[in-house]
């Protein structure tokens, strides 16, 4: 299951970085997508911090594109650290926005983060289309076909541990 989560978060990082790269010179579109993008990335950062029991860097939900790029890459590295150092069945305790204390497994938190990305990425893609732009393809299966084609073409071995 850890290999699966590593692959899923590699996909999210790749797609997030590709989306940001494709929009970096479109200031009009960035005004529409930065709130959703930064919210998703900060939420990921906060969940990582909850699991790792560390402090977060940003208190607000609106960060620049450059900060989104850096934070997304750091989030990916921290998620890999979580997967390497924690058991998926471990329980983490956290307080929600209404100050209610909950406990969830690392597995459930990571699955939630993944779904959260997918939800807001759909909104981001809809905004891009609404602006008359064809967005990059963000489907997981498309990514898998692309990465597998790349690996086959360049004879790259997949490391699964």
What are these regions (language model features)?
Residues 56-96:
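Helix-adjacent hinge/juxtasegments
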Residues 6-59, 100-161:
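Short, contiguous alpha-helical
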